[in-house]
Amino acid sequence: MHDILASLRAAVGGPVLTPEQDGYRAEIAGFDLAQDHRPPIAVSAVTVRDVVATVRIAAAAGFPITVIGDGHGDIPRVTDGILLTTRRLTDVRVDIADRSAVVGAGATWHAVLDVATPAGLAPLCGSAPAVGVVGYLLGGGMGPIGRTFGFSSDHVRSFDIVLADGELRTVSAERDPDLFWALRGGKGGFGVVTSATVELLELSTIYGGGQFYPAAAIPAVLRAYQRFVDSDVPDSLTTSVAILRLPDLPMLPPPLRGQTVAQLRVGFVGAAAEAEDLLAPLRATVPAPIFGTIGELPYAEIGTIHNDPTVPSAHATAGILLDRFDADTVQAVLAVAGPQVATPLGIVEIRHLGGAFTGPASPPDAVSGRGAAFGVWVSGAPMQLPFDPNAMSHTAAAVRGVLDAVAPWSTGAVQINFCGSVNTAGGGRRVVARDH
């Protein structure tokens, strides 16, 4: 291994670290603290040339490479080869006239929002703008206004990718369409993506936000939501409902600290008056919220709809796609995750899909989830610190219990960006790509 280390340190401008060195643990850390990676070599690329050099050196030595961007993805434990981090490739260049952005592999959606929104342009980002752009796009991307505009990867123009032999290639619908098909939804394994060029929307505001309801109201909120999405909801409206068990932390608003709540999440593209009319039947059948607002929202603040966690933690996660969500599904969810259940589950979310999520993609892609009516996302975290593997096993069992509860309504597949550690344990669930 001495030879490959020497070659990497001579060719790469970023840190090349081994387990005994300072900075190694911080370099390989991801968002899920339960993922205890221990690669013999960690390489941090600070330029695209670093990626090319690392891939070529690893290929010559027969060393496998695992790539981590911002670290939010669910990656099996890495114990061999090279862990290559791209989080320092953070360049974002916006072309206002072309309505496009070139985004480095380490940049987050926050960085794109910061540059694009002052010009009245909007990237089709996810619910958590702190997530890396490239990893999100490689899985498709189901965001807060996705029923209107589709998967985020539908708006990718091209990728720059370093292939297994070290060749740097620009891939688009016109140049290498087969690889472009695979990269939009296939998630990984085709090379190291160093940047993506994405289309931007001409959109400066939306109508949206999140409202929270007390534990006692959770059954009524879920039942009202089910009836609402079973009605004729236009594609301009994207919603979800979540059962949240929130920690008692000072960073949370006082009404929510330590509480079990339901949250209604709304993203609407159009006039506020139209949105109010659409939501009126739902609001008329649920109690008053205890916190939160839904109204006109600058696109730069789209992350406040979900307010997803930004602090790394040890957690167990899973997703599943449903072909329907009816009154019996609601009852099944309440039985395993309702306010009466003592559980380590932090979130059980039901997302309304359909609309532009159903495709078809043009050009074709490998995105999983087109055609599903709903998506379920589940995450749990042991409350005690330090991290206890036994507690994580209990948490994973609770997450699996939700998957089992909704199995009668499942398509049998998972949207790949929502394929979590519980999905992949022991073989996991199917992730289905579209026919090519």
Per-range role (PLM):
Residues 1-436:
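Soluble FAD-dependent oxygen oxidases
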